[in-house]
Regions:
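Active-site helix-to-loop segments that bind/position phosphate- or nucleotide-bearing substrates
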Residues: 1-131
């Protein structure tokens, strides 16, 4: 269902339609005996939990935040568990929350201004996760 939600496709009313679509996109392989194999690309993109796939769980996204410019002290180290497509929005949000920001007061209201636009982070992460 995640595949259809992410691409904003209507979810097929029958299981056969779901399987046909996933096979046509090479996300699963049909063995024609009622069994299917999830392709690595399907798992790494759409897994709700990459730990369910031992051969690719080490490919999970990982974000390390260092204190200052040295790599000796880490502030946080987070290893993702979701597939790239499923967890992408959360990954962007997490990185944006870790970036430095300035505060300004405008009309008696305090506002936080990010030093790096979200579109830049989104593109950077998309390129870093390129398969």
């Amino acid at each position: 269902q995640m595949y259809f939600d992410l691409l904003k496709f209507p979810y097929p009313s029958e299981q056969k339609g779901v399987i046909e679509r996933l096979v046509s996109e090479n996300l699963i392989s049909d063995h024609f005996d009622g069994t299917f194999t999830i392709a690595n690309i399907g798992a790494i993109l759409l897994a709700k939990n990459l730990n369910d796939f031992p051969t690719i769980k080490r490919k999970a996204a990982r974000v390390i935040v260092y204190k200052g410019e040295s790599k000796l002290e880490t502030v946080s180290d987070l290893q993702g568990e979701k597939g790239y497509a499923v967890g992408f929005i959360g990954l962007v949000k997490y990185v944006m929350d870790k970036l430095p920001q300035n505060e300004i007061i405008e009309d008696a209201i305090r506002k936080s201004i990010k030093l790096v636009p979200e579109v830049v982070i989104r593109e950077l992460l998309a390129n870093a996760l390129r398969l």
